[in-house]
Amino acid sequence: VGYLPSSLVPLLLLLFVFQSPQDTLQKHSQAAESQRRAGNAAGAENEYRVVLTEGYGKLGKVYAAEKKYQEAISALESARLYGPESEELLIDLAIAYFDAEQYEKALEPSSKALAAKPQSAGAHQMRGKSYFMLGDFDKAAAELQAALKITPNDNDIAYTLGLAYLKQHQLPPAQQIYGRMLAQLGDRPQLHIVFGRAYRETGFLAEAIEEFKKAVAIDSNFPRAHYYLGLTYLLKDGASRLPDAEHEFKIELNSNPGEFFANYYLGIVYLMDRKWEPAIGFLQKAILIQPANPDPYFHLGQAYQATEKYTEAIEVLRKSVALNPSLGHNDYQVATAHYRLGQSLLKAGQNEAGQKELQIAADLKSKSLQRDKEKNEVYLNAANLQEANRKFPELNSSEGMIAESKSPGAGVAEELRAGEAYYSGMIAKAHNELGLLRADSGDFKMAAEQFALAAKSNSQLEGLNFNWGLAAFKAELYKEATSPLERELSAHPENVQAKELLGLSYFILENYHRTSQLLSDVIAVRQSNVGVYYTLAVSLIKEGNQARANQVIEQMVTIGGNTPQLHILLGQAYNEQGETDKALEELRAAVSLDSKLPMVHYYSGLVYMKVGKFDEATKEFETELLLNPDNVQAQYNLGFVLLAQQKTAAGIKVMGDVIQIKPDFADAYYELGKAQVQKGEIKDGVFNLEMAARLAPDKSYVQYQLGRAYLAAGRKAEGESHLEISRQLKEKERQQTKP
């Protein structure tokens, strides 16, 4: 059975999107839960992946029907990640890219579908429509011919193939196709309207008129039929057909008084006939129907000017200017609108405002002349229609006829919203369960990724934010952990474990103020975890709140007794107060209790570095790295000390290793670049100092060294510029440190 082009039929998507309330997604989800309960994690994961493949595929269909094309693309691309790429999925993706006007990208999935199934009518059709929009009508026709051969009764394909023939100026084969469609579907007015539009938009105006006449002969009251006929009279023969056009527009309005275009164009016909009052009436009616359209305001302004109603002209012309979408709209209508507005203001005695509008009109006219030149060049030289239409939408005509679609009605829209919620919920649940399975296996990074994907579909899923934050924390993704944990606390402020995880994350991120807030709440409820006291005390010391830190240390002593962590903490406290001998004494006490304790040698190295004992600092950092090779800060400080001792080659090597491990370590780039410049390796030094400046643009010392490096490289202007930036940043720093 044949069917009409997509722009003419109601939305049928729901027939296959909502197969039943308990569709296959529920079955696979239940099967996954059964596998998980049986201890078969791999089987459960496979079932959840099926849920994601089907769920994303159906969600993509819903988004496409809602005209949310980018969301549709995202959903359908996600479906490709979790299961086999079915023909249906690939064609749906091609359609989504096509509807989003990404015609080049639409070719990839349709071509892939065709490679897997050469007899895929849908793949041939989407390739044909995409080539059509890209302006390659030969390829478009070839693909559409292949599609029509496979499904000879598909009238959507036939109609588009007819358009491709018309674009190739091949009238007879297009007429033959449209004749077959008439024989198949019956002699209906809507078919003649569609054919007439195709002929009109491809320049076959006489044929278009004949089709519109056939439409009105079958049904004189068919919506827009007389309007299309009247408009095509004007397009073909101009002012000589004004009476005929007027006659057709009046007939249209008798049957469809609320038809915008009939009111609008009848108003224009009366303008051209200098019949001002009826022109004003019809244009006012058009404005009531489409109050956000700038065009009837523009022409109404002309009628008011002609009748010397300048106050009214000023009002509607200002409205036309305000609503105008672009310079190129309606042959630079906005430039003329400013000109007419200027004239009306002058007539109304508003000379200054009038002159201003006339100047704007002159400027826009100049731009329009340049744009005309560019438009001609684009029209002649553009690689495809998409490029031309993107730069100059006013060049677009028949292309829109194969890309247009109608919005769903209210009832369908409500069902689509329900479908969106349903599939999003199923997808979120599947991602959440996959995250839990990955966490159970110890793959916390992948677990965090799955929880993040679940949140995209349903951020309100119970327990999701905590699971995501915990997985990110265990994967050492501390920055990523903070957002879901903050949301968890916002919803459940009583969750002490979330507070502890969030506080520890902020500590690692060096946000000591937030750490102190959170962990103070934690120790008020959980008083037995010495590690939390330790972290809180360090944060308070870093904040400069020594009195409160001492209180926490006393509580820590009461709970934990004489522990190595206590001595490390006391060592840090003494170091912050400048009592370096006492700090080293406490750190040695920690080593005596546990010589392999992480961080104790690192903190000892910092104290030795502070007092200028670089040999001792080097030994401490090296010892720390033997115990804890992943301590990037220890490695950085080792490199710093080596460079300070003029052990340049060794220091450069260590700093290079630091950057390999942590590519966003600004100070490592800074020290490495500075050392390279001093060594005479100017090019490498400039590169690393540029990286430092990119990562830490507000550091005066970085800008200073980069400026000096540019000068050394002979780049005087850049060098002086960065030295000036450094000076400004130093001044800003001084202002901020003033009491």
Q: Where do the language-model regions lie?
A:
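Structural signature of tandem alpha-helical TPR/SEL1-like repeats
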Residues: 37-43, 66-78, 100-112, 133-146, ...
